[in-house]
Amino acid sequence: MADSGPAGGAALAAPAPGPGSGSTGPRVYFQSPPGAAGEGPGGADDDGPVRRQGKVTVKYDRKELRKRLNLEEWILEQLTRLYDCQEEEIPELEIDVDELLDMESDDTRAARVKELLVDCYKPTEAFISGLLDKIRGMQKLSTPQKK
């Protein structure tokens, strides 16, 4: 992996580049401390701080991400069956897995999902039971796991 910046340098965030620039997200620049070696061409004679482009990423457990993706695909498949329609026609509802994982018990999770599916005319018990089985043991994705 490439060097992400000099030790002790400050990270500066810049807004996302304009359309047509080929880049999609915000850029992060690392500023070298004054007098640091490798200040780039021109050395200390440059007018502004030397900026070096780097990437910042948040690491999530790939296995957990794969489980979450599979779960979301399963949920979509089940909802199309429950509502007897195409994915685009499913009523506006959001089953927040992280919210369910925060709840104390399966009973409260089941009650929450039942609230969300109140407009569904087909029986939802099998879906709710399957969903609770699938999320058991999963981890929240809102904060990365430290290794």
From Swiss-Prot:
Pfam families: PP1_inhibitor (PF05361). Signal peptide: none annotated. The modification Phosphoserine is found at S21, S32. One of its GO terms (molecular function) is protein serine/threonine phosphatase inhibitor activity. Residues 61-103 form a coiled coil. GO terms for biological process: innate immune response. Its main location: cytoplasm. PANTHER family: PROTEIN PHOSPHATASE 1 INHIBITOR POTENTIATED BY PROTEIN KINASE C, PROTEIN PHOSPHATASE 1 REGULATORY SUBUNIT 14B. This is Protein phosphatase 1 regulatory subunit 14B. It comes from Rattus norvegicus. The lineage of its organism: Eukaryota, Metazoa, Chordata, Craniata, Vertebrata.
